[in-house]
Amino acid sequence: CVFDVSARTVATQSLNIFGDHSDVMACRQTGFAMLVESSVQEVMDLSPVAHLAAIEGKVPFLNFFDGFRTSHEYQKIEKWDYADLKEMCNMKAVEEFRAKALNPEHPKMRGSHENGDVFFQHREACNSVYDALPAVVEKYMAKINEKLGTNYDLFNYYGAPDADRVMIAMGSVCDVADEVIDYLNAKGEKVGIIKVRLYRPWVSSALLKVLPATAKKVAVLDRTKEPGSLGEPLYLDVAATLREAGKNDVILTGGRYGLGSKDTPPSSIFALFKELEKDQPKERFTLGITDDVTGLSLPEVKPAPITAAAGTKECKFW
């Protein structure tokens, strides 16, 4: 099965139904694969990957994108032709899926009880399925790329090939970061972003493949908060990846942003890269707010440079 989810806030000190990643991050241990998009066009392009990979890979998918910021955005996009999608569909896998579906004509028992003598072994038996899933996702991303002329991958890098400062994020903030990165690189700086596409299963080798060898400082952005944790989910995944790869010389920082649909404008991304210029940047930080309690916030760069393309007109409706 595939759940297409507009990621939203889990209410805490007050009710908030707006956009962040706190709900989907609460699903990490369910065993669902997790695919994420950062724009309306990407939702159109990559949602079929979740459905096609779920059928062939035999793993349920949680396909998510930012609530409101992406889910409610009006945008001109290129739509799929159903004939193209049909060409990519593995009908043999569909037939196997249907054959295994619950049916009173050929009943099967699911969810039987197991004691401690065998439960652990059976729980580990699914490892091979999850180990094989990234290759299935890559296969369908390659098919999408062939049809659309795109370059989707498990992780995509954007920016200077010899960047010394890199941010890692997922969701709609990536589009904002692209504009800031273009602006800074045009000024002679060397920065970039790694965009997460397949969040679960996590593939360390795919992340390391796109991380510039020149990267000295890496900032990971999470759109959720786990009180009491050493760091937020994406940060911890990246930290483990760098540690296991022996990249102990890379300075790693982690920050929170955009909780409850808090805006993350270019000024926040400028603040992030400015902080990374320091010899010892903050290990933990927040973007887009003024934290006068614990002092974690980074000062916004204001007035922020204009990063929009020349001739762009901006309008506000209310």
Each model region followed by its residue ranges:
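Peripheral docking tails and interdomain loops at the edges
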Residues: 217-308
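Glycine-/acidic-rich phosphate or pyrophosphate-binding loops and their flanking alpha/beta elements
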Residues: 142-165, 178, 298-314
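Conserved thiamine diphosphate
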Residues: 15-67, 91, 244-260
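Conformationally flexible catalytic loops at phosphate/diphosphate-handling active centers
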Residues: 61-156
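Terminal amphipathic helices with adjacent charged low-complexity linkers/tails
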Residues: 66-104, 209-246, 253
